[in-house]
Amino acid sequence: MMASSDLILYNLVPAQPLNPSAIPNPNPDLSIAAAEPPSSDGATPRRVRPRKSPSSSDRHSKVAGRGRRVRIPAMVAARVFQLTRELGHRTDGETIEWLLRQAEPSIIAATGTGVTPEEAPPAAVAIGSSSVAAAAAAGGHGGAFVHVPYYTALLMQPPNADEPPMASAASASGTTAADENNN
């Protein structure tokens, strides 16, 4: 039995000759009927599935990354997918966040910046020249580094009203978001 949502098309028009004026056309039956079993005259049913229209909106959250996407080599992506399965995470994003937490001591050693969750304000923390200057004032490279275990969580928070928009940072460097997308 066919479902009521199935659409069946029948080829009701016989094959057209190359010269239609040579053969008289006796009013063919072009009526559309409800879904019925194919007739014995050779018409074959064809099922057509309705196509889903592609969504134009991006389903992912935006962060302060100027609309950029992260492109990674295929081998790195394969390893992330494998780790996701091995660690039992539900998404690849969880795996990448886990990897960042594991690598945070090395990141702090390389960059000299970070914020502990106790010191972090409820809004997003700007990691920039002020953090580097504070780390340098605390004792240079040998000073106490501040830890950022939840850096991605800080990025996901909405910006404060008193923070400058990201466009000003792009214009200060001489590039625009359109230039970044073209690279």
UniProtKB/Swiss-Prot annotation:
UniProt cross-references to InterPro entries, sorted A to Z: TF_TCP_subgr, Transcription_factor_TCP
Q: Where is this region: Disordered?
A: 18-68, 157-183
List the GO molecular function terms.
DNA-binding transcription factor activity; sequence-specific DNA binding
TCP domain residues: 56-110
Record keywords, A-Z:
Activator, Developmental protein, DNA-binding, Nucleus, Transcription, Transcription regulation
Q: What is its main location?
A: nucleus
Renumbered to this chain, the Low complexity biased-composition regions fall at 167-183
Compartments annotated for it: namely: Nucleus
Q: What cellular component terms from Gene Ontology apply here? A: nucleus
Q: Which tissues and organs express this gene's product?
A: Expressed in seedlings and leaves, mostly in the lower region rich in dividing cells.
How is the subunit organization of this protein annotated in UniProt? Answer: Forms homodimers and heterodimers with PCF2. Interacts with SPL14/IPA1.
Instruction: Please describe what this protein does.
Output: Transcription activator. Binds the promoter core sequence 5'-GGNCC-3', especially at sites IIa (5'-GGGCCCAC-3') and IIb (5'-GGTCCCAC-3') (essential for meristematic tissue-specificity expression) of the PCNA gene promoter. Can target the TCP motif 5'-TGGGCC/T-3'.
Name of protein: Transcription factor PCF1
**Native organism:** Oryza sativa subsp. japonica
Q: Which gene encodes it?
A: PCF1
